[in-house]
Amino acid sequence: MLQVYLVRHGETQWNAERRIQGQSDSPLTEKGERQAMQVAQRAKALGITHIITSDLGRTQRTAEIIAQGCGCDVILDPRLRELDMGILERRHLDTLSEEEEGWRRQLVNGTPDGRIPQGESMQEVSERMHGALNACLDLPPGSRPLLVSHGMALGCLVSTILGLPAYAERRLRLRNCSISRVDYQQSPWLASGWVVETAGDVSHLDAPALDELQR
């Protein structure tokens, strides 16, 4: 059975400042670097064979730190990018106008084809994330890949594997450097295809982004 591990990037400067990142970028904080190092220790123990990451800077840096710990090369896949938040990227959440907050709410509340102007819908993100995940089926037998991606993108992926709409991602708590696992099973008795084994595990972190619950 193929096991694929899903990791959200470490905490970034804009996470800490409550800015909208999307496909724009900000560097990892000191805490984010430490979180990635703790994932690296876990990845080494798990026997990770491949590290595949979004090509955005914060995920690349997280993947590089993990790769140093488990001796893997880093492969870039732009399908693992975060949801494109269009014209709201780089904005502080507290500065959104009523109209702009309405766009954001339409997106996260599942309004059909809801999106920020010049951005993506959650269904579009889900489709490309599934493409990246399904590519793991072509890896050599015995592979144990780890994908480094983003909070909303991973939430859309996990939600739709569970048979829920992509916007159900808001019901998942995938903190910075949390680890989720999905398995590909083929069974005459159980549902064939991808199944969710764990979601949002932070047991490997000494400070699992508790501040996210307080902001």
Swiss-Prot record:
The organism's place on the tree of life at top rank: Bacteria
One Pfam family hit: His_Phos_1
Binding sites annotated in the UniProt record for substrate: 8-15, 21-22, 58, 82-85, 104-105, 151-152
Catalytic residues (positions): H9, E82
SMART domains hit by this protein: PGAM
GO BP annotations listed: glycolytic process
Reactions this protein catalyses: (2R)-2-phosphoglycerate = (2R)-3-phosphoglycerate
PANTHER family: BROAD-SPECIFICITY PHOSPHATASE YOR283W-RELATED, HISTIDINE PHOSPHATASE FAMILY PROTEIN-RELATED
Name the record gives this protein: Probable phosphoglycerate mutase GpmB
Native source organism of the sequence: Cronobacter sakazakii (strain ATCC BAA-894) (Enterobacter sakazakii)
